Amino acid sequence: MFSENIGNDYIVIQEGTSEGTQVKYKKDGYWYKKDNRGNEGRAEYLVSKFMQFTTLQENEFISYEEGTINGKSGCRSKNFLDEEEELVTFYRLYYNEVGKDLSKVIANMNTMEERIEYVIRFIDQSCGLNIHAYLSKVLTLDMICLNEDRHLNNLALIMRGNDF
């Protein structure tokens, strides 16, 4: 377990749609997330431990540590991005490309299958990436861990320059 005191100048402002939005910090090669409701950090830690026993490669998931941030429970992970890389959420990518709120666009579709296919097509057309395997792994893990907080601001791609 770690214990870290972090000043407000390390806070990373992230706009999101989630009710469970946690305060996030980036400091000394780590991302820190302070618990908002009490056990988010423990859940991240336990799921990352579980992932070590799956068939996924080490570069397909992030390992978390439990600890305290400014005296409050939370977790941290090593920064997995290189200096020239940026994490781009599906939400932000769609807004930048189309100028609309992707969550509102897909909310008007009748079935979950239509919503998923729409997002898959958009990513393929805008980035040239097939995300079927990625989504399959993420959504399978969500079902196993009973994650109810999957949304378009925590599904993302890594961008390096203009390439994904």
Regions found by a protein language model. Name each.
Residues 96-122:
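Amphipathic, charge-rich alpha-helical segments that serve as recognition/docking helices
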Residues 1-103:
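Conserved ATP-binding subdomain of kinase catalytic cores across diverse folds
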Residues 114-164:
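Conserved kinase catalytic-core segment
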